[in-house]
From Swiss-Prot:
Catalytic activity: L-proline(in) + Na(+)(in) = L-proline(out) + Na(+)(out)
Gene for this chain: putP2
Species annotation: Staphylococcus saprophyticus subsp. saprophyticus (strain ATCC 15305 / DSM 20229 / NCIMB 8711 / NCTC 7292 / S-41)
Superkingdom: Bacteria
Name recorded for this polypeptide: Sodium/proline symporter 2
Key word rRNA processing present: no
Gene Ontology biological process terms, A to Z: proline transport
Annotated InterPro entries: Na/Glc_symporter_sf (IPR038377), Na/Pro_symporter (IPR011851), Na/solute_symporter (IPR001734), Sodium:Solute_Symporter (IPR050277)
Length: 511
């Protein structure tokens, strides 16, 4: 257990009713995986993108659930508990980023990916958009996806291991393996359809949980006066601006820049039935996100008073939601709330596994086999896609076996990597006729390298100068934008077909 005190440990330890709820939840996921296998895995496009047949509501909640991960239920409440309301800047940045993403990226990406050779992966879209016959952009972008998503996926497995260790007193490694088995099963067999349906189901569970826990906590404490009590305990607890710096606020706000380049999120826009359904998806998706994030912040704030009043010593702030849900609720409801954490974790892992698998298959294996042969070996590529899910999962499990960082930091590193490498390129690809192959490649590589260099060598110098401690997406994003623009200005453009395609995309989106 991550809670000190034997009497408390006995209160928090999961009962048989909790186990029943978790078993029911796992059974539902396995059934959905089987359903997805029977319905829509006849070819690689169906396995990876659901045949572009997903409705607006599944699109909205699957995008939200795959986006938020265990970070929303474990990482964010833990951060608010530790630092106070100033941690809320990240929720503002993310909400704005997601909202802009639905307007700026979603409609054009849905239309353009189908127009550009029916691309089913982001690297495939970049290749077709820039007429990259040498496949350099496809290979490099595919490599970035594999590297950063393996890092991202392993953060999900860390969350799963922590959950079972904290709530069930189970060994961290056994918990990690249990989560891995279930998520690999329904992703391996059910593909994109199963992942999207499970994400929708899990998104509903997550929302209910993020509303229930803070409301019941307030009832258990002093109602709305609890927030006054939290403010009295420490002045920075209820102040957006205290306990942080201008640079700290900018860094948290900058998380929103990453949305335009997250493959597991924007692939949802590619799979929706029609771009005309995106407004419906946006309204539901943003509402879900804002309510969920505010709930997570409320859990963190009420948790400050809750933990103090009950004299609990919390070793790991990221287990706050687990502790509160197990003490405040009947074991059956507590089991449901633990399932919500699993939902958050597994929805993201499955989406990331699928995107990484599609990149390995579409962007590497097909390339090795050759385009002509690729068309004649659909069943072979479907099997390679499934095996890729397994391989990436095994590597991520191996990395997660010895966790040495917080969930928020792990997610932050991967988020910054994608945001710096892909966000500028996605925007330029959808809006700028002057983008060149060389500019795209240079900007993408520069963004990824700056993020890695900042994490490894610059950030450790934050004690010398605060500027070095800024979130790595900021220098990475700026470096990528500047490099892409100036290199494109002085290198050869793809050709007149780009102008034609961009005009056509613009026209279709307006219809």
């Amino acid at each position: 257990m991550l809670i000190l005190g034997t009497s408390l440990a006995n209160q928090v330890h999961a009962s048989w009713q909790t186990y029943i709820m978790i078993i029911i939840y796992f059974t539902i996921l396995l059934f959905i995986g089987y359903y997805g296998y029977k319905q829509a895995t006849g070819n690689l496009s169906e396995f990876m993108l659901g045949g572009r047949s997903i409705g607006p509501y599944v699109t909205a909640l699957s995008a939200g659930a795959s986006d938020m991960s265990g970070w929303m239920i474990m990482g964010l409440p833990g951060s608010v508990y530790s630092t106070g309301l100033s941690a809320m800047w990240i929720t503002i940045g993310l909400s704005l980023g997601a909202y802009v993403n639905y307007f700026v990226v979603a409609p054009r990406l849905r239309v353009y990916t189908e127009l550009a050779g029916d691309a089913i992966t982001l690297p495939d879209f970049f290749k077709n958009r820039l007429n990259d016959h040498n496949n350099y952009i496809k290979i490099i972008s595919g490599l970035i996806i594999v590297v950063f998503f393996t890092l991202y996926t392993h953060s999900g497995f860390v969350s799963g291991g922590k959950l079972f260790e904290s709530a069930f007193g189970l060994n961290y490694h056994w918990g990690l393996l249990m989560v891995a088995f279930i998520v690999i099963f329904y992703t391996f067999f059910g593909g994109y359809l199963a992942v999207s349906i499970t994400d929708f189901f899990q998104g509903v569970i997550m929302l209910i949980a993020m509303v229930m826990v803070p409301i019941v906590a307030l009832i258990d404490l002093n109602g709305i006066d609890t927030f006054k009590q939290v403010a009295e305990m420490k002045p920075t607890n209820m102040n957006l601006f205290k306990g942080t710096t201008v640079l700290g606020i900018i860094s948290l706000f900058a998380w929103g820049l990453g949305y335009f380049g997250q493959p597991h999120i924007i692939v949802r826009f590619m799979s929706i039935k029609s771009h005309k359904l995106l407004p419906k998806a946006r309204r539901l998706g943003i509402s879900w996100m804002v309510i969920g994030l505010l709930g997570a912040v409320a859990v963190g704030l009420t948790g400050i008073a809750f933990i103090s009043e009950r004299n609990i010593k919390l070793e790991d702030p990221e287990t706050l939601f687990i502790v509160m849900s197990q003490i405040l609720f009947h074991p059956l409801v507590g089991g449901f709330l633990l399932a919500a954490i699993l939902a958050a974790i597994m929805s993201t892992i499955s989406s990331q596994l699928l995107v990484t698998s599609s990149s390995l298959t579409e962007d590497f294996y097909k390339l090795i086999r050759g385009e002509d042969k690729a068309k004649a070996h659909e069943k072979e590529f479907l099997m390679v896609g499934r095996l890729s899910v397994l391989i990436v999962a095994i590597v991520a499990i191996w990395i997660a076996w010895s966790p040495n960082d917080t969930i928020l930091n792990l997610v932050g590193n991967a988020w910054a990597g994608f945001g710096a490498a892909f966000s500028p390129l996605v925007i330029f690809s959808l809006y700028w006729k002057g983008l060149s192959r060389t500019g795209a490649l240079a900007g993408m590589i520069t963004g990824a390298l700056v993020v890695i260099i900042w994490i490894v060598w610059i950030k450790p110098l934050a004690s010398i100068n605060e500027l070095f401690g800024m979130y790595e997406i900021i220098p990475g994003f700026l470096a990528s934008v500047i490099t892409t623009y100036f290199v494109s200005k002085y290198t050869k453009k793809p050709g007149s077909f780009v102008t034609h395609d961009l005009d056509k995309v613009k026209q279709i989106v307006k219809e």
